[in-house]
Amino acid sequence: TDGHGEVNITQAMAMSCDVFFYKTIQQIDIDKLHTIFRKFGFGSKTNVDIPNESKGLIPNKEYLMKRYGKYGWSRGTLLNLAIGQGEILVTPIQVLNYINLIATKGNSPSCHFVMVDNLPSNSKPELEDNHWEQVYKGLRSAIISKKGTGRKSDPAIDGFKVYGKTGTAE
């Protein structure tokens, strides 16, 4: 195939263009990436109402150096992190919280299985409105664009918009 060609963030999200994210992550410090993941609730417990909840794993430089040694982790390790694979471990409830944070621009209570008043809030990632809009545009394009990886998921119901992102579990 000819590949995706040159794409912007919206197209990269819609077409699930790994190369775009490989190039992007090489411009971000691993510890900065770790901080961003943590702001969205990954790498820490959600305190959902189930025993023995795992916090998952979002690797930082310290973790990678301890695991692989000073020069042991490769660019490939970093590239895998860009697409949510490799050393990343997340729980289904963390993914649910993440989607809720995106859907509400960070104004989402944390998820619980038991109904209670005054639910604690998720961490609120501070993003500029144009960043939220880029995310929404990419998630919508994954469903409605001709090259979107989720294009067959649109129910085409008036007044009902589906947003989504396909992915590959490791």
Annotate each predicted stretch with a short phrase.
Residues T1-E170:
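Beta-lactam-recognizing serine transpeptidase/beta-lactamase-like catalytic domain environment
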